[in-house]
Design a protein with these regions (language model features):
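SAM cofactor-binding core of SAM-dependent methyltransferases
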Residues: 7-57, 68, 76
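Class I S-adenosyl-L-methionine
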Residues: 11, 33, 45, 54-66, ...
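Phosphate-coordination loops involved in phosphoryl transfer and adenosine-cofactor binding
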Residues: 3-5
């Protein structure tokens, strides 16, 4: 890290999937989460503080050049929709987070699952950024893991140049890195999930809700250029 690096505040940072991608794009990252992810932060080298998202935004917002937020996705997920009343048990934070980020006055990105109430988001799929793995007995597998990214605060995201390609058999990363009812069973499943996601440092529990660093890198490259453009206008 260098003093000239732009600072990105990563709210709901979890196991550091987004943080790693933004770091690879050139940002210094400050991670905020109510759960303890000091181990992950230490392994990949970003600053971490255990606190609520709004406390982190209040304390570190002025230091940040940009903000990324990944509010809890369970309320909007397909799995929750399968059980009547389950979604309502989870917090609905996309709206409050957006309002707070707009008030912060920094370029921002809100990430969530398909079905979340995001404004004009860009969707990324593992096939768009070449995320694959191999598993004994199953050969080459592709990662789908569709995620939405809403830009705000003046930031615009160009759509991906490639479309989804679900030709390969899919490795599904859910259930805390365990195969569950998936047809992919046996030794090496969790390791294959980590390889497909590009998150070698994560625990099984962190895998479930993480985004691949490649997604955040794709966003981060455009965010970095946006900040350069803003600096050139001053």
């Amino acid at each position: 890290m260098t003093p000239t690096q732009p600072v990105l505040l990563d709210l709901f940072s979890g196991g550091g999937g987004a943080a790693k991608g933004y770091m690879d794009a050139g940002f210094m990252v400050i991670g905020i989460d109510v759960e303890d992810h000091c181990r992950a932060a230490g392994r990949i080298g970003f600053e971490f503080h255990r606190m609520a998202w709004h406390e982190g935004l209040e304390k570190f917002g002025d230091q940040a050049d940009a903000v990324h937020a990944s509010p809890p996705c369970q309320r909007y997920s397909r799995a929750s929709a399968c059980w009547p009343g389950l979604a309502a048990q989870y917090p609905n934070l996309v709206g409050p987070v957006r309002e707070a980020l707009e008030a912060c006055g920094r370029p921002f990105v809100i990430e969530n699952v398909e079905g979340a109430p995001l404004h004009n988001p860009v969707m990324l799929c593992g096939s768009m950024v070449g995320l694959t793995t191999t598993m004994p007995g199953h050969g080459k597998l592709g990662l789908r893991r569709h995620r939405l990214f809403e830009p705000g605060g003046g930031l615009l995201l160009a759509p991906p140049r490639t479309q989804c390609d679900h030709t390969l058999p899919t490795i599904r990363v859910f259930g805390h890195g365990r195969p569950g009812n998936s047809e992919l069973r046996g030794p090496g499943y969790a390791a294959a999930c980590r390889e497909a996601m590009g998150v070698w440092w994560m625990s099984r529990d962190e895998l479930d809700e993480a985004i691949p660093p490649a997604y955040a890198y794709w966003v981060g490259v455009q965010l970095m250029q946006h900040l350069r453009d803003l600096a050139g206008q001053r």
